[in-house]
A protein has these predicted regions:
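Transmembrane helical bundles of ABC transporter permease domains
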Residues: 284-322
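Short amphipathic alpha-helical segments with heptad-repeat character
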Residues: 273, 287, 291-294, 298-301, ...
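Short, flexible segments with low predicted structural confidence
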Residues: 23-28, 38-40, 271-272, 278-279, ...
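Short N-terminal helix-initiation segments at or just after the protein's N-terminus
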Residues: 31-32, 275-280, 450
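Juxtamembrane/interface segments at transmembrane-helix termini
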Residues: 2-7, 272-289, 313-319, 395
Length: 547
């Protein structure tokens, strides 16, 4: 395939089509412990990326869901590519004819997608009975020799190439490139092998175009019924019957020839089974190994997933409810994120009463300190910020009125994690190690969230350490959010002219979940304890009842 005709930077991602013994899982692309891309494994878990995927996911194909999950787990940093994806999403929203045609295309391909996986990863156990891969089974073990799976699986690729030719032509560059990628696949050698016929020569496979015109070669027929072997077997039986009829007639026992014929008939299915087993082991299995390791076929499956992903974005924007927007993608040296009326993409789903907040991380306010009592919406706000960054960075809608962002090189989210302590290191050392890791990997185009800082030490040490760490992030230029109950720290930073400050708003009835300017100096810990049934009065009542 001519890779220049597709979004080149996207092909740097690992394909969703597995080259191994089993099909890939939808969530196989989640970051590992040693991954240092835009997201690391700890951040991925802390921001509830799996829940975000569940909220956004409206893809219908396995490839589409895998591509969407991969986009969230390993987001792009190429602003031009994301802008092209947004252009394609806008075209689908405005061009109903194209959207409906593409939706029908993806619906049709979904029916054949599983057939491809059955061919590539199925085990064919032999026997006369066959399991048709269009029967809806999830298992990867089939009786028969793989003929049905070969026909259905290769038919998926053939249908995709042929159907693409009759779709309305898009105007957006991203969609045009994906369409062209399918056409390029139709010109590849691997497509010729999938389409057939396939010729076998000394253990190697040749396409129709590669076969010498006047050289007779064995042609693979994906069927247990083989006309030529059957013809020769029947001819041999007929010749044998003719010979034995004449020979036995001379002894007056010509009737025995028919008995010999009856005994010889079962040889025919034995021969056919042997040929079918040979087809499976010498043609189907080797061919599918070639298919699984084909970058061209992997890209074709990726294209299906990428088209389904775009349609999923559109369906998500319609189903979520309320204001939705595609954020403007800016290219700057420093990270920035500005959103009006932001609603959390997980918590606000189908919740018309969710309280929106504005987000402003710019040059003047790249250090944002959020204070306030527990249950006031501080953590939800921070997760909204990071989840918006992630959705914008994959070309998806965000639940907001207006948005603008710069793609982040790195996104970090630190939360207290006392349950995973390193050997010989207490909570303070463990969390400080994580903060150090974040700091030394951050750049001016990074987004960092610190949910509490320097826990597990004395107040004086916490103040000193937090102050110089936050000043360091500020000088570094990364967009940094700190969640804290420490208003004394805020006062020190304010004295240095560093940071912008928000606090959770509370009414007499409780939290409003709106963040307003200022520094909170109240706790409301008694209110939270009372709501949980663990206030001072609850403790005293329990002790009184025990005595």
């Amino acid at each position: 395939m001519n890779s220049s005709s597709a979004p080149n930077s996207y092909w740097n991602q690992k394909p969703v089509l597995s080259s191994g013994q089993k099909p890939s899982g939808i969530r196989d692309s989640r970051p590992k412990e040693d991954d240092y891309g835009v997201l690391d494994a700890k951040t991925f878990d802390a921001i509830e990326a799996d829940e975000l995927f569940d909220s956004v996911n409206h893809a219908i194909t396995h490839a589409g869901q895998s591509v969407l999950y991969r986009s969230l787990a390993r987001p792009e940093t190429d602003a031009a590519l994301i802008q092209k994806k947004q252009e394609a999403v806008r075209e689908l929203a405005s061009n109903s004819m194209l959207r409906e045609a593409l939706q029908h295309f993806v619906d049709t391909m979904k029916e054949g997608e599983q057939s491809l996986y059955h061919l590539l990863y199925g085990t064919f156990t032999g026997g006369i009975a066959v399991d048709n891969s269009r029967g809806g089974k999830d298992e990867m073990e089939f009786s028969g020799y793989g003929y049905h799976q070969f026909i259905d699986g290769t038919g998926f690729a053939i249908d995709m190439v042929e159907t693409m030719e009759i779709l309305p032509q898009p105007q957006s560059a991203y969609l045009r490139e994906l369409f062209q990628a399918v056409r390029d696949f139709g010109k590849s050698r691997i497509y010729s092998l999938l389409r057939g016929p396939v010729y076998v020569s000394e253990g190697k496979f040749k396409t129709r175009e590669e076969k010498p015109r006047y050289l007779p070669l064995s042609r693979f027929t994906p069927s247990m019924f083989k006309p030529i072997p059957v013809f020769f077997a029947v001819a041999a039986l007929g010749a044998a019957l003719y010979f034995f009829q004449g020979l036995l007639a001379s002894f007056g026992i010509a009737y025995l020839g028919y008995g010999i014929l009856v005994l010889a008939v079962p040889i025919l299915p034995v021969v056919l089974i042997a040929i079918a087993a040979s087809d499976r082991d010498t043609v189907i299995y080797p061919l599918r190994k070639l298919f699984k390791h084909s970058p061209e076929l992997a890209r074709l499956v990726d294209v299906l997933g990428m088209l389904d992903e775009l349609l999923s974005f559109h369906r998500y924007s319609v189903a979520f409810g309320g204001k939705m927007t595609l954020p403007e993608i800016s290219e700057r040296e420093r990270h920035a994120l500005e959103v009006t009326e932001a609603r959390n993409p997980v918590l606000a789903r189908a919740n018309s009463n969710y309280v929106p907040n504005d987000v402003s991380l710019d040059e003047a306010g790249r250090l944002l300190v959020i204070t306030g009592p527990n249950s006031g919406g501080k953590t939800a706000y921070c997760k909204t910020v990071v989840q918006f960054q992630l959705l914008g960075q994959i070309g998806c809608y965000i639940p907001a009125a207006v948005g603008r962002l710069v793609l982040a090189e790195h996104i970090f989210y630190q939360v207290p994690d006392p349950g995973h302590l390193d050997e010989g290191m207490g909570r303070f050392g463990h969390e400080l190690k994580r903060t150090r890791e974040i700091f030394f990997n951050s750049t001016p185009r990074s987004l960092v969230v610190l949910d509490e800082l320097s826990e597990g030490t004395t107040f004086e040490e916490k103040m000193e350490l937090s102050e110089y760490v936050l000043a360091g992030f500020y000088k570094l230029g990364a967009s940094t959010l700190l969640v804290t109950h420490n208003h004394e720290l805020c006062e020190r930073l304010q004295d240095k002219g560093i940071g912008r400050y928000l606090q959770g708003e509370f009414s007499p009835q409780g939290p409003t979940y709106r963040l307003i300017p200022g520094v909170s100096r109240v706790s409301h810990a008694d209110r939270v304890a009372a709501a949980l049934g663990f206030s001072k009065e609850d403790v005293e009542k329990h002790l009184a009842s025990r005595s």
